[in-house]
């Protein structure tokens, strides 16, 4: 469990051409603020983080929640704290799954170097408002290097960012039961060179997942609060196969979306781009608003605001 790996003093942990296996669904790896995780896989031998059933051959195509996932917490800025504490070391927030507090003032904070690794069959539901993802980046800074990563069959989001400035390159997200990519609380990093597939997925109650390829927020309680979420997304192919939106933008988020392909199934998907509320729509033309360039939208309709649709 988290208590087995969470340390208050700064530590450095390294994985080299390794297989990390958890044998219970509540085990998860937490990197605390000030600590570093170095993953040094290779294209021929990536580091694999997975559940025990993956080794025994008992894992199924729809398996999830075989272990909790990877949580990385840093000392960068975010906006989910008391307004008086914004931009100070007192601006901290408590991570999901009792993973500890995160946040600070160093947007160049370094939580390690991670390349060529897979996170498979992860995620855990504590409550509907407290869930572990495949990977959670909590106020992680831009000094952290993340590249060549796949997250597969996460029971919540594939990758979620809570503030911070960390970027990711060369990534694949498949089989998430909630959103494939999710950000909130002032994330200002980047995601480049990726493939994201939001697939038809059977839920535990027999229903089908109708979540989004991207679910993007700033802060629900104060949509204009700085630092505002404004990541750059480039050279990514998004495929929404069923149910939800390909891009759902809400709660004041901004986005730079460049040189990408955004596709959905027009019969089964809710929308290609859904700007979900009036406040986010109003921010579209402002600095750190919404910018789309060199991007192909391959679907029959786009929601600009709730109950407003443009056909093209």
Tell me the role of every PLM-derived stretch.
Residues 2-9, 302-309:
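Conserved small/polar residues in nucleotide/adenosyl-binding loops
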Residues 7, 11, 39-42:
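Beta-strand repeat architectures
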Residues 16-34, 41-42, 46-156, 160-308:
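Extracellular beta-rich repeat passengers
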């Amino acid at each position: 469990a988290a208590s087995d790996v969470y340390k208050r003093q700064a530590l450095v942990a390294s994985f080299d051409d390794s297989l990390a296996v958890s044998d219970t669904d509540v085990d998860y790896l937490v990197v605390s603020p000030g600590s570093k995780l170095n993953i040094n896989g290779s294209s021929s031998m990536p580091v694999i983080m997975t559940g025990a059933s993956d080794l025994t051959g008992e894992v199924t195509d729809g398996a999830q929640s075989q272990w909790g996932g990877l949580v990385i917490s840093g000392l960068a800025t975010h906006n989910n704290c008391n307004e008086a504490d914004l931009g100070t070391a007192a601006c901290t927030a408590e991570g999901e799954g009792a993973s500890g507090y995160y946040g600070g003032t160093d947007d160049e904070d370094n939580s390690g170097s991670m390349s060529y690794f897979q996170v498979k069959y992860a995620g855990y539901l504590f409550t509907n408002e407290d869930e572990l993802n495949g990977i959670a980046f909590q106020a992680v800074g831009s000094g952290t290097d993340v590249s060549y990563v796949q997250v597969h069959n996460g029971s919540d989001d594939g990758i979620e960012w809570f503030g911070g400035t960390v970027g990711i390159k060369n990534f694949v997200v498949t089989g998430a039961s909630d959103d494939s990519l999710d950000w909130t609380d002032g994330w200002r990093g980047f995601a480049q060179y990726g493939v994201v597939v939001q697939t038809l997925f059977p839920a535990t109650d027999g229903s089908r997942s109708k979540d989004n390829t991207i679910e993007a927020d700033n802060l629900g309680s104060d949509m204009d609060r700085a630092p505002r979420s404004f990541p750059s997304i480039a050279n990514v192919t998004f495929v929404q196969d069923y149910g939800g939106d390909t891009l759902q933008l809400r709660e004041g988020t901004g986005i730079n979306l460049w040189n990408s392909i955004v596709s959905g199934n027009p019969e089964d998907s809710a929308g290609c781009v859904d700007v979900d509320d009036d406040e986010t729509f109003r921010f579209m033309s402002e600095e750190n608003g919404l910018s789309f360039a060199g991007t192909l939208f391959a679907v029959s309709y786009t929601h600009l605001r709730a109950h407003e649709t443009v056909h093209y």
